[in-house]
């Protein structure tokens, strides 16, 4: 967002219309990254500033408001594999203010409300940096946990919630209530998790909020249980059921019922008390064991809360005061460039270490050459750092008054820092790119991508191992992974018999993956995991795809010309053709093993929801899943009321118990094997 924007009141209708369209697109993209992908690319205050601009534009030009505007929506879509849950009472997001003056204006508007008499008594609470959580109890027993989702439809995370120690499975009273709050990851647990992932060669989480969201939304509750999540509950929508009249009383009552409630709430009555609370926790935020990104102010009287009601998106009875980003000055000592998997060459500022929001910071991404030129960052400059989302260091501005007299504009490199090839700007891109397919940096990043969970899922093969394999010249491309042997792996640092056997098994198992994993793992530009599945479901095998032209690929629903042209260009490269031949030689599967749209419509499995649990003896779980999907079944990870059949092998656990409690049809392996024979 530019700081030189024309004031909204000075814009014509056409000018406002021209600004609103790209602004909505930008906010929609950022919102999708934050809510659906748990992977924000901009810091909160950048999003907030853009969002406030859109609010102002729509207030000034109400004829431009549309139902699909980000101002009219709550949260994000719910596109994961988790079961969907409808919220009986919508879970709305909060409005934001960014200064004491804006907060006082909000309170003044409340008290001037012509229809509702608002007493100036507020309950202040810390705004926990996590994700919203709903817990539903029937007769005192936990029956459902869900995320906010889009405010109306959330995701069922009941099994995962049961692994969180601070969530009571049963209340001391037989109440039927919904309790809402925040699921978060403590700072210590976040640091521990990222250290573990880094040691295993896995990508680290950008911040505790993303880590909490990713952990709570796991398909496997065992993963959630290992992540040390915690909760603070703060709201009972139907407060009459717990016999309270104020928000402060509601918090106390939740504590009595066994919920974890943040102890730092305070009832206030005037500006001085509000300012004191904000100043107190602005100073203390770095010392807390959990992340906060602001203060929440709520009308304390709950009947008044109901009378004030909500807008289409936010409550009128509460508001979030967002902390301004903390800044520190430091000096840029160098600018280094790194090469990514797709050839993107990214600059990073190396600076004198400074303490920022509780951690030592000495590096910050400069994103791309345009960003570097726009901010005119130079070696020797004094710059101001803040943390995007309180986590990611970013340069906010250059102090030109301290720029050295002999300073010269930074010269953007023209050659790849790793392989020395000429760097290029591709049409429509801001990034510099190395287009040498044999660039070592790209190959190593590509190997890590190939082995990643959503690609070939080679457990234990992270960047640290890949670096060693490369340095010892044991691999040069992904096909080389399948030629590794026992003796070669034993030469790696910290590799013994067990780790060697485990990695070889993992590599060998990956040969049998369905081909969409291979297509995604090849790292073709613009081809994500979802697109790879759609494409391979259509073509059935890799050879058919390689023979297709761009028009045929582009015509597939949900694909389009950008992906089609990218795939054809990729497979036209003779080095790629050679690599595919090598993968074929080492036995990597080229066929689509999932359910295709041409599955037999008369199959008794067609359209059925099936859960596999326990150990199978006559086949692997993967083989059973592939057979079911080939016959039209939908194989899911969790048991719900929508599940049709649970196939239970030996040592089946909680899924079997849940299926029996829900009255779902349970088959043993012998019944399933017989059904497979009859289907033939």
UniProtKB/Swiss-Prot annotation:
The protein's job, in short, is:
DNA ligase that catalyzes the formation of phosphodiester linkages between 5'-phosphoryl and 3'-hydroxyl groups in double-stranded DNA using NAD as a coenzyme and as the energy source for the reaction. It is essential for DNA replication and repair of damaged DNA.
Q: Gene encoding this chain?
A: ligA
Recorded GO cellular component terms are: cytosol
The reaction(s) catalysed by this protein are: NAD(+) + (deoxyribonucleotide)n-3'-hydroxyl + 5'-phospho-(deoxyribonucleotide)m = (deoxyribonucleotide)n+m + AMP + beta-nicotinamide D-nucleotide
**EC number(s) stated in the UniProt entry for this protein:** 6.5.1.2
Can you supply a Gene Ontology BP term from the record? DNA replication
Which SMART domains does UniProt cross-reference here? Answer: BRCT, LIGANc
Could you identify this protein by its name?
A: DNA ligase
* HAMAP family, sorted: DNA_ligase_A
Cofactors required? Mg(2+); Mn(2+)
User: Which keywords, in A-to-Z order, does the entry hold?
Assistant: DNA damage, DNA repair, DNA replication, Ligase, Magnesium, Manganese, Metal-binding, NAD, Zinc
Q: Does the keyword Manganese apply?
A: yes
One Gene Ontology MF term: metal ion binding
Record's family?
A: Belongs to the NAD-dependent DNA ligase family. LigA subfamily.
Binding positions for NAD(+) per the UniProt entry: 44-48, 93-94, 125, 148, 182, 298, 322
Cross-referenced SUPFAM superfamilies: BRCT domain, DNA ligase/mRNA capping enzyme, catalytic domain, Nucleic acid-binding proteins, RuvA domain 2-like
Q: Which PROSITE patterns match?
A: BRCT, DNA_LIGASE_N1, DNA_LIGASE_N2
UniProt domain BRCT: residue ranges: 600-680
